Every structure is written in structure tokens, then in C-alpha cells.
């Protein structure tokens, strides 16, 4: 007897659902790369999950649910359960004497042994085959019990044997009408009163359990059928049908049709009257006239001449007129100019501005001139203009350095006027020399800083090297 090396993971989990299962050893025994991938992430009573580990775990759960995942069975007790069942089936097969039943049961045992000899076995298949074996064996036992209880007398003796009838309380008239003894081969049926009938004795038989089909029965399913020589004679008798009650014997000829859901039936047509049939018939049609049909027909309409009946031709088109000769004489240019000037003046008077004239020029495609600022325009504050330019991010122009003192005095003279808009820059122009000196000092300071920076960096490097040497010496 060869023991199995693998078993179903689903069966193992169902059998050990109340036991504590260690995740590490369990995943090492399960066959498949998914279980090994998840088992590598198990350690220190914790599981480290990433995307790949979760996908492998879901695939393993799907295989376990579909009963396609297997695991190693190290203990021999886990695989000896089916072999013990197989031994019990063999013991039951020894007592089977019928050749047909023995052949069918032996084929089931051969299929179970073939499944147990392979390395990978599905417990569901073995359980289905075991159920088929016990089902066929129960059928064989039920047939054997029925055959053992049938009488062994000859057919002639069976016809002379009468079945015992139970004594039922019948009225005296019925008991008097019954014969004293009726042979079995000629039964005489007597109709008892309503709802009272006799039932023959039925032979005791074992209750046969209903055959329950399995969910994965093989295609070569077999059904045990006994041979003709072992067929059991049917000794059952159907009880007589009780007579109909009194209220059902006489059924009315017409059935009520006014029940709910019944379709109404149209009444039959009334019968013909008993009077003479000729009086009720319609009068005959009038006879045709005896005159000639051709003379009675109206004459056809006269033929119309198509040439005379055509509509008249359309009228001729109007004559062509020369546009040059038909145009009116032009109006005097002087009068035309006066009218245009009057219209423009009226438009300017009504509108109050030159917008209409500007629009007309734009429509005519003329090049417009730039508008000249008005002489009396309000003066703008230079400070506000400067601030607005700074806010807008415009680049300010640099001040021109005045080298000649005479030019500076001339500028001051030009600026120092009675106009208030020009006297605002007086203070700024007088401080030009001081501003230029400050700019020169700022440039000298930047040059000094630029020259000192390499020296400072060289000094810092020496100090850093000295510090590192001191640290090493310490």
C-alpha cells in the first residue's frame, strides 16, 4: 500500500479549523510559488506585506477556495483515512454474490485505488466515489431483502393462495351481500358506501432511501439492474377507487360563468319568426330598361383642339435702356459741397464731438494723424510720474553727469524760472555735485572690498589648515 505525499489544502484547513496553525510551517508545506513568496515575508510573528505579496496572497486564497491548492502530508495518519475506508469497502464486496452488482462495485474500488496511488489527490473525488459505492451497495441490499421475503411456492400454489383481508365494520346489508369465500384469481369488487373501502394487506418491505445524486458524478455512471431470473414478482394491489360523493354525481348541465376572471359569452341569436319568409325578404332590384344601351348613354364630350386650347405666349421683355443716357444730370458741385458741409455741421452740433467724422475716416481707410495735446492741459506732478514708473517696473534713465560748472549754472538759470512746474527740479539740480561725489566714494568702497576678499579667503584657508594640524597633534 502506497501512501500519498500530498493532500488538499482546503481539506486540511476544514479538518483543523479549531486548531492553531503556524503560518510559517504551513506556507512552507503548501506547493506553489505564491505560498513560498508569502512565506518569505513571515517572521517574528508578523507578516510584511507589499504589493507583490498581497497579489500572491490573493492568488493563493483563490486556489484554496477552488480546491486546487495542495500541500505536503508528512504525517501518515492524514492519508490513511481513505485507505481505511477502502478496506471497509473491500470487506463489503466479499459478501456480494450478484455478478452484475459485484462488477459495478469492483469498478468503483478500482477507480478509488487509482486515485490513491497518484501523488496529488483531490479529496472531493474520493468522497464522491465512496458515496457512489455505498449507494450501489444499498440498492443491492434492498433488492436482496425484497427477494428473500417473496414466497417460494410454485405458480399454481400462488394462484390458490388468498390474501388475508382485515375485518372492517360494515353495515349488515353489505355483509349479507358479500360471498363467504372468493378465490384470489377471480376477485369480486363490491362498492361499499361512501368513503369506506377495503385495503388489501401489503407485504412488509424495507424503506429504500432515495438516491441522492452527487455534484460531480462521472460520465460513465452505472445503474444496477437485476437479471430476469432474479426479478421479483410484483405482488402489490392497487386499492379500489372510492365512489363519487352524492353531490358530485349529478352535475348541472350549465356551469356558472359569472365567476371572477371568466369571459362573458355572447347570447345566441334570436330564432327566425314563424311568419312567411317571403314577406321578410327585401324587394327585388328594378329590371334593366329594354331600350338599347347605346341610345341611353350620354354623348361623349367634344374633342378639343390642342392647337387652339394652348395658353397665349408670354409678353415680350421690356426694351433695354442705356444707363448712360438715362442717368439724370449731375448736381452742381458747389451745391453738393454746401449740402455736405451743412450735414457735417448738423452732426457736429448734435454729437458734440468729432467721433462721427473719425468713424467716417476709418471706414474710408484714411491714415489718421496723431492728436496734439491741448495747450491748456493740466500739468502732471513729476514725483507721481516717477512713482508710477517705479511701480510699473520701468527702467529709469541715468542722470547725465555735468562736468562743466558753466553748463550747470546755465541749467540752473534755465530751471529757475517763474514757472512752477520747472522750479520743482531746482533742489535736485543744485545737489548734482554732491551726488556725483557720493557715487565715486561708493565705487571706491566696492573696489576695496573686492580686493580684500581673496586675502580674507587665503587667511581663512591657512587658519583652517592650522586648526586641522593642531587637532591631529592633539
Swiss-Prot record:
Residues 354-371, 382-399 form the WH2 domain. GO terms for molecular function: actin binding. The keyword Secreted does not apply. It comes from the Viruses. Residues 163-184, 204-217 have a biased composition (Polar residues). Residues 227-237, 434-460 have a biased composition (Basic and acidic residues). Residues 152-328, 366-385, 434-474 are annotated as: Disordered. Probably plays an important role in the persistence and survival of the virus. May be a structural component in the envelope of the polyhedron or the envelope of the polyhedra-derived virus (PDV). This is 61 kDa protein homolog.
